[in-house]
Amino acid sequence: MARFVPAVRPEDIEHDSERLVYEALGGLPSGYLVLHSFPWVRPLRDLADEPLREGEADFVILHPEKGLLVLEVKGGRPELRGRTWFRGPREMRDPFDQARRNRYALLDAVEERSQRSVHRDLFTHGDVVVFPHSQYDGPLPLNTDERIFLDARAMSGLAARIDD
């Protein structure tokens, strides 16, 4: 079984959507490290005098041979209208941009803190958006691909899909 950090009881996870994903990731075999609600702080650009920006990856999955995978989880029933994402009547940030931004912020931090001895070209990395509550049949934006998107239909096999 995968190791979780922090190791929490699923019922203590505030958002049901993240709880569902946390439970599904419990099916990952040993060797995986799953970081939940992983915060990061980075300069806006790679300049030291730039303002800092904060972010949080819903899940970061690490494996010594398979690399790094960032999961962005969106509950409810997100839908794309034109070029804008909505959850109900409320506009929301593009989940695919969020996942990508989280991944690159983490990769930048790893490179920086390792003094460039660990470079992103040395391991596989990616990001995936998960809609655990809904079966999404709408269009996907051009900045993504169906292979990096999972909805409620994939939840029962989520761990197996990630382990592939």
Task: Put a short name on every predicted segment.
Residues M1-D164:
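Intrinsically disordered, low-complexity Ser/Thr/Pro/Gly-rich regulatory segments
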